Structures are given as C-alpha cells and as structure tokens.
From Swiss-Prot:
Record has Metal-binding as a keyword: no
GO MF annotation list: potassium:chloride symporter activity
Record protein name field: Solute carrier family 12 member 8
KW Transport (keyword) present: yes
Parts of the chain that traverse the membrane: 36-59, 71-92, 98-115, 122-141, 153-172, 184-204, 232-251, 272-295, 307-329, 361-380, 392-412, 579-600, 606-623
Superkingdom field: Eukaryota
GO biological process per UniProt: cell volume homeostasis; chloride ion homeostasis; chloride transmembrane transport; potassium ion homeostasis; potassium ion import across plasma membrane
Species of the source: Rattus norvegicus
Alphabetized InterPro entries for the sequence: AA-permease/SLC12A_dom, SLC12A_fam
Region called Disordered, residue ranges: 469-489
UniProt subcellular location: Membrane
Pfam family name, one: AA_permease
GO terms for cellular component: membrane
Membrane topology classification: Multi-pass membrane protein
Amino acid sequence: MAQRSPQELFHEAAQQGVLARSQPWWKIQLFMWEPVLFGTWDGVFTSCMINIFGVVLFLRTGWLVGNTGVLLGLLLVSFVILVALITVLSGIGVAEHGWMGSGGVYSMISSVLGGQMGGTVGLLYVFGQCVAGAMYLTGFAESISDLLGLGNIWAVRGISVAVLLALLGINLAGVKWIIRLQLLLLSLLAVSTLDFVVGSFTHLDPEHGFIGYSPELLQSNILPEYSPGESFFTVFGVFFPAATGVMAGFNMGGDLREPADQHTPRLPSSCWVSRGFSNIIFAFLLGAVCTREALRSDFLIAEKVSLVGFLFLLGLYISSLASCMGGLYGAPRILQCIAQDKVIPALAFLGNGKGPNKTPVAAICLTSLVTMAFVLVGQVNVLAPVVTINFMLTYIAVDYSYFALSMAHCGLAQSPEPMPRQGPDALHCSEHLLQDKAPSYGSDTPAGSLSEGTLLEFTKDMDQLLQPIGGLESQPRSREVNQVLKSQKHKCKKDAKQTLQDSFLLDAESPLSFSMGASERLSVASCGEQESYQNQQTSRSESHDHLVPDLCTQPRANGEDFFLKCRLQEQQVQRRPSAFYVCMCNPWVSLLGALASLLIMFVIQWLYTLASMGVAALVYLYIGQASPGLYLGSASNFSFFQWMKSFLVPSCRSLRSTREQIILAPSPAKVDMAMTQAYPGQWQTSATRERYHRSSFLSREQLMPPY
C-alpha cells in the first residue's frame, strides 16, 4: 500500500486501515476516541469557506439592495469586504511573526498586546460569537417557519432552541463523520450559488417580483430608497455580520497537524476574496432582475430567482448550521484558553477538557446558555447590530496589534527622532562607563593600572577565572589573534566572557589606551563580537526593510543600534521566511482600518458602542487587579499616545517640548592617568583594607574613663 500524504482528508483513517477493508456496522467508531487534527486544506480552507457563507448573504442581500440601491449597495458591500480584508491581512502579519496558537484571537492579541488586553478582547469576541450563533439559528428558523407556513414568533424561537440543542449534542460528542463531510457541504454551497446565478436568466416569476433583466429596472434600482426608520448605517449594521467568519481559520491554529505550514496564513485571505466576489454577484443580480418592493419585503426573494429553489434553501440551511457550529466550536475553545492562562481566576473551572481532543465541555455548555438567551429575541435585524459592534471591536484590536507590533519591531516606538551627533568621533552612550576611573581609597595603586571597582576590573577578574586568550605581547601577535577570532566567530558560540560583556553593556572600542595586558585582552576578545554584531545588524536591517519597508527606511543614529539590539532581544519576536503575501500587510493600512472601524461603530449604534467600550474597560481593570502578573506582550514598549506626541508636538513650535539632556564630564582621551600616594612608604596597612568605609558604635561607658 502506497504511503499517503499527511495533507489528505482521510489520512488518519488510511493509516488505521479503515479504508482498506470493510468492517461490520457494529464495529464502526462514530465518535472520536483519539485526537483528530486538521490539514491545511481540509481544515482551514473548508472551515473558512463554510463560515463566511452565512445566513446574511442568503436572507439580507436583497433587502440591502432594495434600501440602498444597486450603486450604493455595491459600495457598501465593497467597504465591508475591505474592512474584513484589512483585518485578515493584519492577522496574517501577526501570524508571520511566529504566532499560531490554540486560543485563536485571544492568543494572537495576547502575544502582542499582553494578557490583560488579550483577555478583554477575547471575552468580547466570545460574547459576539454567542450572539452571532443566535442570529444564524434565528435566520434558519425564519426560513423553516416560512416554508411550513408558521408566522408565529414563538415557532421561530422553538425551532431555534431545538436546533441549538441538536448542535450542542453533536459538538459534545465529536462525531467523526461530521468533520469529513466538510468538503461535501462546501460543494453543496457552491451548487446553490451556481443555481442562483443560472436561475437569474433562465426563468421568470413576475408574481413574486422577479421580472428579469431590463435597463429600465436597473435604472430604477440604481439609487437608494430607504424604508421608514432605515438609513445607510443601519443597513450597514445589519449586513456587516456577513464578515464575521473571517477569523475562523485563525481560531483553528491549535487543531492543525502543521500549524507552521506556509500555506496556512494565506488561506483566510483567499477565502475572503472568494466570498467578496460572491457578495458582489448576489447584490448586482438581485438589483437587476427584481423590483424594489419585492427586494425590501421578501427576505427569500433569492429563492424565487434560483432555478431550483430547493438547492438554494439547502445552501441556506447548510450555511446557517455550519456558521452556528463554527461559533459553538471556536468560542468555547477561546474561553478554555483564557481559563487555562488564569486571566480571570473565577473562570478557572472552564479550563478543564475531556477526551483526546480536550473538549471544553463546561465552556460549551456556558456558551450554549448565552446563545439560547439571545435566541429568545427572535429577530435577525435586532441581533445583527449587536454582533456588528462586538466583532468590530475585535477587528480594531487585531488591526492595532499588527500596527503596534510593526512599530515596536522596527525600533521606532521609543526613538522617533535621532539625537544629533556632535561629530564623527562622538562617544557612544555606553562608553563613559569604560572611561571613568573611580578612585581607590588608600590602596597602593601603581601607575597605569586599572581602577578598582569598575566594570573593567570585573572583566579583568573574569579573564583570570575563565582563562581566555593569553596576554598579547606584540602587535603582530594581536593581528594574528584577530584573524583567528574572525575565522571562528561563525563556528562557535559566545563564551561566558562575551556574554557578560553584553549584559554589562561593555564597549571595547574605547579611545583610552590602557597599559596593562588586561585592557588589550578585552579589546581583542570583543573585536570578533563587535564585527559579528555589525553583521547581525546589517542582516537584521535588511530583514526589517523586507518586513515593513515604510517604517524601516527612516534614518537612525548609530548610537541607537546597540539599544535597538537590546530591545529586539527582549521582544523575542520570531520571523518566518518572507512570502509573497507579506508585502500586502502594511501597518499604516491597519491603523487606518482600525480608525475607520471605530468611527463606523459610533455612527451605527453610538449608545451600544459606548456601553460595550465601558464594559470592556471594566473587564480590563478587573483583569489587571485579579491577575497582575500576566505577560506584557511583544509590543509592550510601544505607547500609542507617546507615538502621537512625538509626531504632533514637533509640528507646533509653541508646544515643542524641551529635550532632556545629560551633560557628562569629558574624560581625557589620549592621556594616561595614575593615582599615587602622597607619602610613599607610610601607612602600608591601608593597602590591605577593603573598598568601603567602616563605622562602629561606641557606648557612653567606653568613652568615659573608669574611676
């Protein structure tokens, strides 16, 4: 039997020989008794495509065109696609820095902005997923009730609750064949979409408002004509939940066989481009073949346009159930990851999992209860704005995460303007530690020796302990050692001495000439390190230009390179090999997308936006008090307000802040100084005393002579 590729959909079953031989029906395992991991295409691609074909596309596209018109409707659909695409590209940019965790959006934001912000946004995202699941179930129940002729609102709620309980049982049991039906479900969605396109020019139904293509009809539907109480932004708030499935692929990072696969990050963007193309086709065709009255009043007008209405309804049912199933799958696992990280101690019981895949049973039950509470609302147009605000807050956090990570990664967060240099021989900010000589109190210090208690004295002691390269006696010997160090700098690791020099910010390129061999050994031993560091800085700057070309092309002072190296080591940001789609990730575009989303939130539902932001602020403060020791994030050294101040204040001369400067006493560059005793030969015992002043306490009895 040939060896199968691990990317195949039935790879796990083929290894067990299930496909090779038939088994009796009573021996077939329907439930997952072992961990099941997804591949790149059968996991990420199919999940993204099924989740983004939601109920809003099938039930509210005609209503959107009937209110906004064809022209403004296409503009609204394009704007929704653009906002979601910017978020997808921002998520790809964060994932390319090494993130791919099991917590989905929570892990992504926590790795950049810290656990406190990640926990806050993660809880908002979980709440939005629960409300979105209720909206999908309500849309499914509306279609079933219309098909059965049931106009009662309680019929819609009863159908929604029954379907929710069925999906809850499937999610808890983990039926294996449900996972393997994803490609089949995706094929049925494609067939239903094709059925709608073919039906738009193969038949007519004037009784229900489907009169076919005509220039007069398209011209009458080109301009907006809103229903009473509707506007552009209310329609936008109802239609935006069509973009809520873009993060489904990122939420599956912990259930992939190969999370670091190079194809994984680009699949969500490919899926969303396909979804955007489908939205535009739906909006244009409905506006070109149906009357405005039918578009605004009949939510199932697309079913009348389809050639075979049953196929369209099948696609609607599949998309509704799959989207709800995706919410019941992703939200509990994010909640489980938050509980496992102990972000909120009160939710620690939700971190336990059962079964081989660590199924979060408690989290699934909790999210199902929240979903059931919103199912009782029973109206899609009421639930859609709630979903919109929560998801837009999440998308703002993702966009800002990539912007902050890019700014912190390029070292522009703390130093937007380089300090002017006084000359080509200006000292580095770490050189004064090497050149200042502390006095030795009373010790017998010969001329030309190193001063006691300095970092160079510590380095000399480490030379004696670690026994590095021996003393250099002549200039030819120094050149020979330099050549040896240059040849071996890429073959061996740093020794302990060089590691200590890095940690104490020692700089070997000092203009002072020390007479002892220890200083010569210091300069020679750190020569190889300085050259390797310069090479690393060159390669790192090239990779930075590759990563964010707009940010890294700004000039930077040479004295800042050393501290930039230290900051990058603290951030511990990983980079993968650059791919062709990385150039599409731009931090400035992400920032503009975040600001645009924030503005739209206030225009759609400003009251609910303020309430959501207030709740988020309270959760943020509570997490800070309950769990103060959370991870700060790789972009913790970036402050948005300091960054804004650095750009806005210099533009106004009257508001220009004075730069703080520290004046250091100049040290003689080419003069050797030594300390000698004022009276040689006397007080020899003072040379053996330790390097600090002593004090003692004398009582009254010791001071008064005895009588």
